[in-house]
């Protein structure tokens, strides 16, 4: 009996492992084969290159600068691609038959949501790291401050991707999710003059405080937590919609 029980447990563990592997593989395959994701990556990459070229052309001969000095401006352009990628990743699930295919591959919706979150997080970290790393290397000056700024930028861009994807999954509308993400992430910093201190509670302005790190450590940490709360809330809303919806 004990031998049979051990065998059953091994088989159950193997089955769960296989199910997780299948779910992760399916989600990764969707991300890398979705044309909109590649277009979004191209937009982000082009924005990064254009921003760096503009900065380098305007630098006075012999004047050095590090990534920490251009990170906020650089990110304002690059994050547009990450917003588009997040909305596209979620939108493809509902604007096409991809959502039903996902459920056929991974019927357990909780596992599907977790696999999707892990794949998107990994994708965001890799894509952001590549772009930030290339821009860091292009800067004339390298320092610990530049590396810290690069790390904060990677975290922010990944959060933008997850926030947009969460909005897309929750709203199930490409137009609605795009509008909400653009307002929250891109327009809020531009409206900070009119919104005053209230702007700090929106992810876009909080992200700028997080990136510049020019304020007190408490304010920077608070900004990071605000971004985390917004991202978590958007993802949780998307997960709840996935688990409770009919398809």
Q: Could you say what each language-model-derived stretch is?
A:
Residues 21-30:
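Cytosolic juxtamembrane amphipathic/interface segments immediately preceding
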Residues 3, 10-17, 26, 35-89, ...:
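Secretory targeting signals
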Residues 21, 92-93:
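Solvent-exposed, acidic/flexible segments
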Residues 30-34, 96:
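Membrane-interface junctions
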Residues 94-117:
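Interfacial "coupling" helices/loops that link adjacent transmembrane helices in transporter permeases
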């Amino acid at each position: 009996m004990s031998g049979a029980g051990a065998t059953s447990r091994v088989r159950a563990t193997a089955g769960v492992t296989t199910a997780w592997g299948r779910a992760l593989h399916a989600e990764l395959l969707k991300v890398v084969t979705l044309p909109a994701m590649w277009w979004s990556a191209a937009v982000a990459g082009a924005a990064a290159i254009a921003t760096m070229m503009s900065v380098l052309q305007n630098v006075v001969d012999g004047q050095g600068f590090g990534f920490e000095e251009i990170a906020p401006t650089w990110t304002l352009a690059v994050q547009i691609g990450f917003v588009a990628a997040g909305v596209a990743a979620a939108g493809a699930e509902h604007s096409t038959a991809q959502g039903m295919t996902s459920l056929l591959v991974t019927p357990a919706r909780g596992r599907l949501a977790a696999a999707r979150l892990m794949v998107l997080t990994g994708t965001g970290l890799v894509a952001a790291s590549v772009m930030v790393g290339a821009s860091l290397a292009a800067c004339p000056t390298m320092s610990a401050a530049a590396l810290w700024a690069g790390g904060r930028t990677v975290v922010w861009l990944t959060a933008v991707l997850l926030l947009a994807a969460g909005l897309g999954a929750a709203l199930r509308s490409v137009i609605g999710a795009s509008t909400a993400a653009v307002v929250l992430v891109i327009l809020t910093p531009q409206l900070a003059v009119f919104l005053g201190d209230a702007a700090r509670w929106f992810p876009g302005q909080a992200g700028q405080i997080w990136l510049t790190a020019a304020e007190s450590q408490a304010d920077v940490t608070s900004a990071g937590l605000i971004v985390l709360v917004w991202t978590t809330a958007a993802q949780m809303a998307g997960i709840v919609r996935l688990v409770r919806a009919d398809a």
